[in-house]
A protein has these predicted regions:
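A detector for short, charged/polar N-terminal pre-domain segments
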Residues: 1-7
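Short amphipathic helical patch at the helix-1/turn junction of helix-turn-helix
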Residues: 6, 17-18, 45-46
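Short basic helix-loop element that most often maps to the first helix and adjoining turn
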Residues: 10-29
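Conserved hydrophobic/aromatic packing and binding residues within compact polymer-binding modules
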Residues: 12, 26-27, 37-40, 66
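Residues within helix-turn-helix
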Residues: 24, 35, 53
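Recognition helix of helix-turn-helix/homeodomain-like DNA-binding domains
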Residues: 31-46
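DNA major-groove recognition helix of helix-turn-helix/homeodomain DNA-binding modules
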Residues: 48-65
């Protein structure tokens, strides 16, 4: 696992939880399955920039907030 993928996943999970969203909520909004989102949040996935942008939009934040 790359450190950047782990950091991205932690940021997504933190922001999602702050917004009181479940993984199911965000998956439905994005059309993802839970396994895909779980892997991203665990730092096991390597999402494309387009995927990161979709996640950011669903969370109502700028993409760079997820990449910090």
């Amino acid at each position: 696992m790359k450190t950047s993928s782990i950091k991205l996943g932690k940021n997504i999970k933190r922001i999602r939880e702050q917004k009181k969203m479940s993984q199911g909520d965000i998956c439905r909004a994005l059309g993802f399955d839970r396994a895909q989102m779980s892997n991203i949040e665990a730092g096991k996935g390597n999402p494309t920039l387009a995927t990161i942008e979709k996640i950011a939009q669903a969370l109502g934040v700028a993409s760079d907030e997820l990449l910090k």
